[in-house]
Amino acid sequence: MKRVLLVVLAGVGLSGPASAQWLGMPVWNSPKGGTGITISGDYGKPNADWGKGNAFGARGTLGLGSLSATLGFASWNPSGTLPTAKSVGGDATFRVIGGSLLPININLLVGGARATATGVPGTTTIVAGGGASLTLPTPGVSLEPYVSLANRWHSASGSTNSNFGWTIGANLGFGGVMGAHIAYDSESLGSGSTGGILGVGLHLSLKVPLGM
């Protein structure tokens, strides 16, 4: 098991590093988008095929309506004696359908990050895909369930592999600046293995004037 997980961390062989660009985290998404600044705190729990352990991260998102840009980091500590993997990266999303007048939202997503861990090569991950969500009119709470489909390319030591994955999740707002998010991410690793990550978190949404 330790050898397999080292291969995962190195991003070579049959699988890539855990989850999306931030190791140990789902591919977070919000097809609806928005305006202002959102600060998110995240927790990820990979399954056995990903090496278990715990991941913690933080993200900052600038929303400009249809376009959103995010920067963030995560620290994933796999089970056993494997080294902690730290990743820094970002993503950008563009809403192509939806907005305040439509309950259905569709967006495109592209992201990337660089991950490092002691004793293994650094890994670069690129994610590209899109998602769809519904804006549900729930009293006192904003609810956005979504599904995302994305390909994930993982490159380390001159070797690149490609995996397909999907994410189901929901973003919740509680009528003010506070909100929550939850997602489950699944990635096909080949040889009958499927990596799964459950992620949860809280976020603060600041509707600041952006002069646009």
Where are these regions (language model features)?
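Short glycine/proline-enriched coil/turn segments at helix->beta-strand junctions
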Residues: 63-67, 88, 174-176, 204
